[in-house]
């Protein structure tokens, strides 16, 4: 059954349904409503109203996204890139990453322990493998080098 989004009430209801499932950014919500056939003017009006009512919040979305991705083992560089691709402002992203309260070094160590069972690399090939994995996950080479050299280990 296809829902027709030809009224402001229908657009608003669909937006609220999406927001009830999880936080969304304005750009992401706009894209989803357009895919469902809503007119751009109605989308803007509905989203402006939801923002005024506090139901749509970029800062809540950023906080939720950063927290979720960090718990999934991703670092700040990867999270920053994903949020940029979702149309969020760089300054807002940087602020959210600074204020999230996550210890990125602890996050790096946890991700490394889960993947590699806490075993430091024994040769250059293994070191490169672990470094590539952690770099892909969004951690800086400086943090990775410090970890893999054994300088930041709590054990």
Curated annotation (Swiss-Prot):
Compartments it resides in: Cytoplasm
GO CC terms of this entry: cytoplasm
Keywords: Cytoplasm
GO annotation, biological process: regulation of DNA repair
Principal place of residence: cytoplasm
Any Pfam family hit: RecX_HTH2
Function: Modulates RecA activity.
Annotated NCBIfam families: PRK00117.2-1
Family to which the UniProt record says this protein belongs: Belongs to the RecX family.
HAMAP family according to UniProt: RecX
This protein's name: Regulatory protein RecX
Naturally occurring in which organism (per UniProt): Pseudomonas fluorescens (strain SBW25)
């Amino acid at each position: 059954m296809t829902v027709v989004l030809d009224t402001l009430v229908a657009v608003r209801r669909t937006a609220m349904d999406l927001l009830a499932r999880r936080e969304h950014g304005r750009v992401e919500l706009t894209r989803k409503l357009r895919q469902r056939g809503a007119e751009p003017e109605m989308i803007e009006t509905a989203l402006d109203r939801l923002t005024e009512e506090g139901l749509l919040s970029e800062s809540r979305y950023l906080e939720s996204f950063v927290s979720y991705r960090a718990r999934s083992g991703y670092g700040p560089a990867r999270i920053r890139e994903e949020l940029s691709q979702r149309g969020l402002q760089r300054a807002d992203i940087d602020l959210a990453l600074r204020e999230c309260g996550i210890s990125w070094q602890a996050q790096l160590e946890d991700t490394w322990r889960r993947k590699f069972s806490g075993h430091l690399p024994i040769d250059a090939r293994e070191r490169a493998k672990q470094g590539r994995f952690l770099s892909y996950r969004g951690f800086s080479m400086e943090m990775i080098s410090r970890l893999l050299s054994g300088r930041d280990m709590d054990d």
